[in-house]
Regions:
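Short, low-complexity N-terminal intrinsically disordered segments enriched in polar/charged residues
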Residues: 1-39, 142-145
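Generic short beta-strand segments
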Residues: 94-102
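Short S/T/G/P-rich N-terminal loop/turn motif that feeds into the first structured element of a domain
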Residues: 1-8, 85, 104, 121-123, ...
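A solvent-exposed, acidic/Ser-Thr-rich amphipathic alpha-helical stretch
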Residues: 11, 30-89, 95-96, 110
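A short, structured loop/turn motif at beta-sheet edges
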Residues: 82-91, 106-107, 119-127
Length: 145
């Protein structure tokens, strides 16, 4: 990876993040992800699926996320936007991605979404201190205007 100010390094970081979330065995690569998320229990992590209140800290997410998950694929589908704040010690990124989930009951989701992440530089490395994906699910028409 090149300089933290180099867009290529942020593209690489986002792609490694997506790869760590992808799995054929139902569990993301939590060892890699534990180095990406700040260890603080007050880090707020939202997801595209419940719980709506999100997770407080990486460990809570790791223990509770998708117990019936059989596979997950995450792929960045567009350019990353990078906004540096606080002399570069805080960076906000966002990018579109495609997400495929499969569950043990045979259901699944194909989602086009955008993720926003707040990264903070700690001990020379950027870690996620807040994450929020957003998407729109297809909703069946209600017949009401």
């Amino acid at each position: 990876m090149t300089s933290d100010n180099d867009m290529a390094s942020w593209n690489e970081r986002a792609d490694r993040f997506c790869k760590a979330w992808s799995s054929e065995v139902g569990r993301p690569d939590f060892d890699t992800l534990s180095k990406v998320y700040a260890a603080d229990p007050d880090v707020v992590i939202y997801d595209t699926l419940p719980p709506i209140e999100g997770f407080r800290g990486f460990e809570q997410m790791r223990q509770a996320i998708y117990p019936q998950l059989t596979y997950i694929h995450v792929r960045r589908t567009g350019p990353i936007d990078v906004k540096r704040l606080a002399d570069g010690t805080v960076v906000v990124t966002s990018y579109p991605f495609h997400l495929s989930y499969g569950f043990s009951d045979g259901t699944g989701h194909e989602i086009e979404a955008r993720i926003s992440e707040v990264w903070e530089k700690r001990s020379g490395e950027y870690v996620i201190v807040h994450e929020h994906p957003s998407t729109v699910y297809a909703v069946a028409p209600t017949g009401k205007a």
